Amino acid sequence: MKKLGDVAFWRIAMRPGRPMAVGRIAADGLQEESAAGARRTSASSSQNDRNRAILFGLPGNPVAVMVTFFAFVRPALLRMMGARAEAPVLLRAASEEPLRKKPGRTEYQRGIVTQHPDGRLTVRTTGNQGSGVLSSMAQANGLIVLGHGQGDVAVGDQVSVMMFEGAVG
């Protein structure tokens, strides 16, 4: 991607999805090198944005692709289309099981959220959270979001949950 354009970022502190990249490339794929060694697109500066495409480099594992698409790519595409892309709504739910988490990165664990007759929400994982376990995404109705500095979660602790649109039930 560096040869075709500019890398905005590469690798993020999240799991799954760490090897995600975002950048801009010249629409015609051509770059010019200035005498000082700085790259620029072959288009004039006034046409620069129109002649550049945004490139999302997604991870290789299917679950990591789905998580990064849901968390980053979908909102970006909606904004680019002129739609109002609001930040995903985070609900709070009580964890039905202990969750292991090391501080230092944000984790998105696939979860099954249940709304009880009294209105309270609980969540449990779909089981194995490996980024290649596609069935974990198929079973989930949301993502348990464990923040960057957060550690382990005990049964009954409140956690943030990002729902897949309207899937509580």
Model-derived features: positions:
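Flexible glycine/proline-rich
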Residues: 2-169
